[in-house]
Curated annotation (Swiss-Prot):
It comes from the Bacteria. Belongs to the bacterial solute-binding protein 1 family. One of its GO terms (cellular component) is periplasmic space. It is found in: Periplasm. The keyword Cell membrane does not apply. It comes from Rhizobium meliloti (strain 1021). Pfam families: SBP_bac_1. The keyword Transport applies. This is Alpha-glucosides-binding periplasmic protein AglE. Part of the binding-protein-dependent transport system for alpha-glucosides such as sucrose, maltose and trehalose. Keywords: Periplasm, Signal, Sugar transport, Transport. Residues 1-27 form the signal peptide. The lineage of its organism: Bacteria, Pseudomonadati, Pseudomonadota, Alphaproteobacteria, Hyphomicrobiales.
């Protein structure tokens, strides 16, 4: 799926570790000394410490983070170890999706698993391999996460008996609803950052009228060619339809041929299928590699002024380009005419769940409810949170803070739709359908083809 694909290229996961790495932490590993930096909510750590004595116990956690991200996660759980006295062992695997299935079904699960695939979590819950986190945690998410109902919805699955319950805790989020630009180019041309989709469209037309190309769009990605267009469609779907319609779409409760879906395709086509709007013309969209696509922002003169992509894309900016200085981004705006849809955010992220019900596992979920469990990672890199009680000034750099504020201002959050669909669709027919669409095939024909593929796996 797309999430797995991007783990290998994201700035948030540049370094790979060795399969089966295990990590322990103690007080000597604390990145920031408790009480010394007033930006951090040390009181939340002290309060947590009072009620959790786990000396003599061991907590095992299995997750997707390796290399640099593993070291960052270790810097967080070091505070859990210091507060509780528990021995904590973290491990991962290059094929972590398969490994967690093997371990849980074999009866040798970790105490806590952290995964970025809601579909896989749903499978584990349906097999009775997860422990419900309870109504208290559900209420906590509603009260403490911005767009709280969205996070409850994302974390709720059907158990083995078919009863729905909260099985997961969202922790470490990625934002996809971003449009990238070069401030100097905007300043030179007299352009302003749009606040609505109508303004974004007007800016697109203005740039074209000025004889320039507004957008750089590239769908090329080897065997995964087409996936960047699915993010476009998902973002536009959330800005033209209620979130409930989006939810029905990703579950195939409404077909791809529904007007809500083809309408989002057409909105993407407004940008991508107009030769005047895209560097290289519409014919170049499918063949341009997504990694090369943003480079046009930095050409002199610019080959384009706008680029839609998730938070990882600076990994592929030309060497030496600094986000916040040489490049910046803005939230992909909502439609003025659709104010009732609020400020939707498309993204991805990881969710923690209890795969072996132990006091230490339950304590770890409680630890994730403390601001300090978020702020320690925020202060470094590669971490965003919708937790309303954190101090956003802790973020390690202004771009991270800006993305964090986008999450906090969201009225709705939805997970990447193609990652919620069956692999044959979300990492297959949807991708190839988008290539056909930018190549000139009608939205109706593309939608019919994807739906036919979905019907074949029922």
């Amino acid at each position: 799926m797309k999430r797995s694909l991007l783990i290998g290229v994201a700035a948030f996961a540049l370094l790979a570790g060795t399969a089966g790495l295990a990590g322990t932490a103690g007080a000597a590993d604390l990145k920031f000394k408790p009480g010394e930096d007033s930006r951090f909510n040390w009181a939340s750590l002290e309060e947590f410490k009072k009620g959790h004595d786990l000396k003599g116990q061991t907590l095992t956690i299995f997750g997707p983070w390796r290399g640099e991200d593993e070291a960052l996660f270790k810097s967080v759980y070091a505070y859990f170890v210091e507060a509780t006295g528990v021995e904590l062992k973290y491990s991962s695997s290059e094929n972590y999706e398969q490994q967690i299935v093997i371990d849980t079904q074999a009866g040798s699960p970790p105490d806590v698993a952290i995964l970025p695939q809601p579909g896989l979590i749903a499978d584990l819950a349906a097999k009775g391999l997860l422990t419900p986190l309870g109504d208290e945690t559900k209420q906590w998410l509603l009260d403490n996460y911005a767009a709280g109902q969205s996070w409850v919805d994302l974390s709720t699955y059907n158990g083995k008996d078919g009863t729905s319950a909260l099985y997961a805790f969202p922790y470490k989020i990625d934002v996809k609803s971003l449009v990238w630009y070069v401030p100097e180019n905007f300043e030179d041309a007299g352009y302003e950052v749009p606040k609505t989709m109508e303004e974004l469209k007007a800016l697109t037309e203005k740039i074209a009228e000025d004889g320039e190309k507004p957008w750089c769009i590239g769908l090329g990605s080897g065997g995964a060619t087409g996936w960047p267009a699915t993010d476009w469609v998902e973002d536009l779907m959330l800005r033209t339809q209620p979130a409930e319609t989006y939810d029905k779409w990703v579950k195939n409760e409404i077909p791809f041929t529904d007007a809500a879906v083809t309408g989002a395709l057409e909105e993407f086509g407004w940008f991508a299928r107009n030769d005047a709007f895209v560097d290289g013309g519409a014919a170049a969209v499918a063949s341009t590699d997504f990694r090369d696509s943003p480079k046009g922002l930095f050409s002199s003169p610019p080959k384009c002024y706008l680029h839609h992509q998730a938070s990882f894309i600076p990994s592929f900016f030309p060497e030496g380009k600094v986000v916040g200085e040489d490049a910046d981004f803005f939230y992909m705006p909502p439609y003025e005419s659709k104010k009732e849809l609020g400020n939707p955010v498309l993204g991805a992220g990881t969710l923690a769940m209890i795969t072996k019900d132990t006091p230490a596992a339950r304590a770890f979920i409680e630890f994730l409810k403390t601001p300090i469990a978020h702020e320690v990672w925020m202060a470094q890199t590669s971490f965003l949170t919708p937790y309303k009680s954190v101090n956003v000034d802790v973020y390690g750099n202004p771009p991270l803070k800006k993305q964090g504020e986008i999450l906090l201002n969201a009225t709705t959050f939805r997970f990447d739709g193609s990652d919620l669909m069956p692999g044959k669709i979300g990492a297959g027919a949807f991708w190839t359908g988008m290539v056909d669409f930018v190549g000139g095939k009608s939205s109706a024909d593309v939608a019919a083809g994807v739906q036919k593929a979905w019907d074949s796996i029922k």
